[in-house]
């Protein structure tokens, strides 16, 4: 019994040592986390340095203010990197010290375990095996976490590389697009720094909470367990002592009773001597056992005192480490505060630059020269070096007068010759010729198709962000070329009336022989799509006013017999940040004379398609009448629908799509904001729980898993919204900004068995125009 109790005590002490070893392993894991965080910061530094090199190679200007900002930012980042490297070396040194302490503790534990009495070798081997298994488990978990972090970094780097490729294609634009790209890159950099700051704050707070919780909770639990184990050992020893005393007393009473009852008349001294010797031997054996137990108790008491001293030393060391970490956290908070102040300064500078650019653009638009796109690099440098806003108005007046004088005498074509490597300078000083009024373009009702959509809803595509600058530059280059060739008259330098974007009318100017301007109000089909307010409301309003004035000037009629300029209407995209204006690639609008019919590609396509053979198609005319349906063709027990949809009143501005379905559920519509599913049945419900909606565009695909248990009632519909669209609360959201509505897109829905139940494809889309924008 004594040996068993001693063995239990040793097992308990071994468990306590294992728990301490686990604590040391946790501390080591924490230091490994810190080292990995340092590696992550180095990777972030590499990415930021790469971004800086790209920006440095992209911006070709003599702006000393921008270079100064870059130099200050580089010095700040380098100082932060040096601080991080110093802290990394300190953490590595601390890790080596802790590893040496762990090795010393392990050697001491092994020595103590070997010197302990009564511990079997197989139990010790089992302990070693358990420790080795736990260590391997911990190492495996750390490796898995490290690989997950690496995969995440690789995905981020791939995304950044793709963004860099798309951004490098836009470097050929003029000064305004280049400035916009620079501002966009700077905003992304600031956003990443803010995200990094928030992540660092979260990590610091989590580590602080973990340290405090670990120190205050586990220490008391360990002490309570140790005290409880000591009390149990003492109770077991006391119970064993009482039980042994009772057994000895009962045995002695039985022996005395036996001797009294069986003792003969003659006393046998030899037997008495033998019994006395046996009793002495038993007593000596008991005394030896008691001495051994006392020695063992003394050794255990010494070990307990030693462990108490070791725990107190570890507590002191950990408290010192915690204070050092708290100081480092305070330093990092101060650095984060300084970075936040710098970011606020950069944001203020960005706002000032945007306001300055907007004002210069307004002055250039009022000067009447559509070829002036942005201020020069000297103007940007002077704006960067300006300390207050007191001299802005004077500078505006001086710059505007200089620009008006320059644009009244010289017209330089730079953007058109940048692609061929030559620059042509010409001077045109003729005045606009009075011309009669021209009839506006009216839609041909016979070939106009309607669709339940907004009258001006440009098809969204992920490639559209890339092609906006090209569309803007192509419009300006076309205007400059035709102006230099004599097709377009030079716009007058007088101020043009400001037309508000919220008005529902458009002014069409007719110049008479006397030069008097007659205005006529025409219903504006674009009035229902006025952009809403945003953060840069003032800048957006100035851009809208300037673009409306420019379009108003470009819509003036031209001489009869001359070439009509190829003007593309400018549309404001509500989804773009700051209401970035884009040029829709609609077919060119030409004057329509009386008695003449302008054939289009889609007219011939409709005539040819009607002769190909029977197919299921439904064309909806503008009057609301439905054409006769033709026979249905079955494909894999499904139905294919060929249809057309109109996005505006022009006969050439509509979309054709083909959809196929098998069963009750079909994809009825795909727009930039949502994808609509419809239950075709009028009597039975459709269970779409677990279905997967797949949206493929280009070389990418996005899928959405519908909620389990989702049931569509008869003739009910479900909309899966894009992330950037306006939707009600609790709707199904896809992880994509806006759905692609080009001919390069395939939208399908699959059931739980991965069977295709319906798909939707656009077969033609005149709003997209050039297909070269979609090849990557």
UniProtKB/Swiss-Prot annotation:
Region listing for Coil 1B, in residue ranges: 70-207
Ranges for region Coil 1A: 24-55
Q: Which residue intervals define the domain LTD in the entry? A: 653-764
| Protein's GO biological process | heterochromatin formation; nuclear envelope organization; nuclear migration; nuclear pore localization; protein localization to nuclear envelope
List every stretch annotated Coil 2.
Answer: 225-620
Q: Where is the composition biased (Polar residues)?
A: 518-536
Q: Provide this UniProt record's keywords sorted from A to Z.
A: Coiled coil, Cytoplasm, Intermediate filament
Instruction: Tell me which GO cellular component terms the UniProt record holds.
Output: cytoplasm; intermediate filament; nuclear envelope; nuclear lamina
Tell me which species this is from: Caenorhabditis elegans
- State the function annotated in the UniProt record: Cytoplasmic intermediate filaments provide mechanical strength to cells. Not essential protein.
Which PANTHER family does the UniProt entry name for this protein? INTERMEDIATE FILAMENT PROTEIN IFP-1 (PTHR45721:SF15), LAMIN DM0-RELATED (PTHR45721)
- Identification of the protein by name: Intermediate filament protein ifp-1
Q: Which gene encodes it?
A: ifp-1
- Name all IF rod domain ranges: 20-371
Localization: Cytoplasm
The segments labelled Tail in the record are 621-768
Q: Where are the stretches annotated Disordered?
A: 453-473, 518-544
Region Head, annotated ranges: 1-23
Q: Which InterPro entries match?
A: IF_rod_dom, Lamin_tail_dom, Lamin_tail_dom_sf
Q: Show the SUPFAM superfamilies listed in the entry.
A: Lamin A/C globular tail domain
Q: What is the lineage of its organism?
A: Eukaryota, Metazoa, Ecdysozoa, Nematoda, Chromadorea
- Coiled-coil regions, chain positions: none
* Chain residue ranges for the region called Linker 1: 56-69
């Amino acid at each position: 019994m004594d040996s068993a109790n001693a063995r239990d005590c040793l097992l308990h002490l071994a468990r306590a040592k294992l728990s301490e070893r686990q604590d040391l392993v946790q501390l080591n894991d924490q230091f490994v986390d810190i080292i990995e965080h340092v590696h992550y910061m180095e990777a972030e530094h590499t990415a930021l340095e790469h971004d800086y090199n790209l920006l440095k190679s992209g911006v070709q200007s003599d702006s000393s203010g921008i270079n100064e900002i870059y130099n200050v930012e580089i010095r700040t980042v380098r100082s932060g990197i040096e601080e991080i490297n110093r802290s990394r070396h300190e953490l590595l040194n601390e890790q080596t010290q802790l590893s040496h302490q762990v090795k010393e503790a392990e050697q001491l534990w092994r020595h103590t375990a070997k010197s302990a009495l009564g511990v079997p070798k197989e139990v010790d081997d089992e302990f070693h095996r358990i420790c080795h298994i736990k260590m391997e488990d911990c190492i495996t978990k750390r490796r898995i976490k490290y690989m997950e972090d690496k995969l995440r970094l690789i995905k981020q780097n791939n995304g950044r590389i793709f963004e860099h490729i798309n951004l490098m294609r836009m470097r050929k634009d003029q000064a305004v697009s280049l400035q916009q790209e620079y501002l966009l890159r700077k905003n992304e950099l600031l956003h990443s720094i803010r995200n990094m700051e928030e992540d660092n704050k979260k990590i610091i707070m989590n580590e602080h909470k973990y340290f405090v919780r670990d120190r205050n909770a586990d220490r008391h639990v360990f002490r309570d367990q140790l005290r409880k184990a000591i009390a149990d050992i003492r109770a077991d020893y006391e119970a064993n002592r009482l039980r042994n005393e009772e057994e000895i007393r009962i045995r002695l009473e039985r022996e005395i009773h036996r001797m009294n009852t069986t003792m003969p008349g003659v006393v046998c001294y030899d037997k008495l001597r033998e019994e006395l010797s046996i009793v002495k031997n038993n007593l000596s054996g008991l005394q030896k056992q008691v001495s051994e137990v006392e020695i063992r108790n003394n050794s255990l008491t010494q070990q307990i005192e030693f462990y108490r001293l070791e725990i107190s030393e570890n507590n002191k060391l950990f408290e010192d480490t915690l204070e050092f970490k708290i100081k480092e956290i305070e330093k990092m908070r101060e650095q984060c505060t300084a970075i936040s102040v710098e970011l606020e300064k950069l944001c203020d500078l960005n706002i000032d630059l945007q306001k300055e650019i907007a004002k210069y653009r307004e002055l250039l638009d009022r000067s009447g020269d559509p070829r002036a796109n942005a201020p020069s690099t000297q103007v940007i440098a002077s704006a960067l070096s300006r300390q207050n806003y007191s001299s802005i108005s004077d500078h505006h007046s001086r710059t505007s007068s200089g620009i008006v004088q320059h644009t009244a005498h010289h017209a330089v074509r730079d953007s058109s010759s940048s692609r061929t490597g030559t620059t042509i300078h010409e001077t045109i000083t003729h005045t606009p010729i009075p011309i009669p009024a021209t009839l506006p373009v009216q839609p041909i009702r016979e070939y106009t198709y309607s669709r339940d959509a907004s009258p001006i809803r440009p098809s969204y595509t992920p490639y559209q962000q890339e092609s906006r600058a090209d569309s803007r530059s192509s419009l300006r280059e076309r205007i400059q070329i035709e102006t230099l060739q004599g097709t377009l008259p030079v716009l007058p330098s007088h101020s043009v009336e400001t037309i508000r974007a919220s008005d529902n009318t458009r002014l069409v100017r007719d110049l008479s022989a006397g030069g008097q301007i007659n205005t006529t109000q025409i219903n504006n089909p674009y009035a229902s799509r006025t952009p809403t307010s945003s953060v840069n409301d003032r800048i957006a309003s100035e851009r809208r006013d300037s673009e409306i004035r420019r379009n108003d000037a470009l819509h003036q009629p031209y001489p009869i017999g001359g070439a009509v300029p190829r003007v593309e209407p400018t549309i404001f995209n509500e989804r773009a940040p700051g209401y970035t204006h884009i040029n829709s690639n609609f077919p060119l609008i030409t004057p329509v004379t009386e008695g003449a019919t302008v054939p289009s590609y889609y007219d011939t396509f409709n005539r040819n398609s009607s002769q190909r053979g029977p197919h299921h198609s439904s064309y909806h005319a503008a009057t609301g009448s439905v054409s006769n349906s033709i026979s249905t063709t079955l494909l894999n027990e499904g139905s294919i629908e060929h249809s057309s949809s109109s996005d505006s009143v022009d006969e050439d501005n509509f979309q054709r799509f083909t959809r196929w379905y098998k069963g009750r559920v079909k994809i009825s519509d795909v727009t930039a904001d949502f994808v609509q599913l419809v239950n075709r049945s009028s009597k039975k419900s459709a269970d779409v729980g677990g279905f997967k909606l797949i949206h493929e565009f280009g070389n990418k695909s996005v899928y959405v898993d519908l909620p389990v248990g989702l049931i569509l009632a008869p003739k009910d519909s479900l909309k899966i919204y894009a992330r950037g669209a306006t939707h009600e609360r609790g709707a199904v959201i896809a992880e994509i900004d806006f759905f692609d509505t080009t001919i390069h897109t395939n939208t399908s829905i699959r059931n739980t068995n991965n069977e295709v139940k319906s798909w939707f494809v656009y077969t033609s889309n005149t709003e997209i125009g050039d297909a070269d924008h979609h090849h990557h």
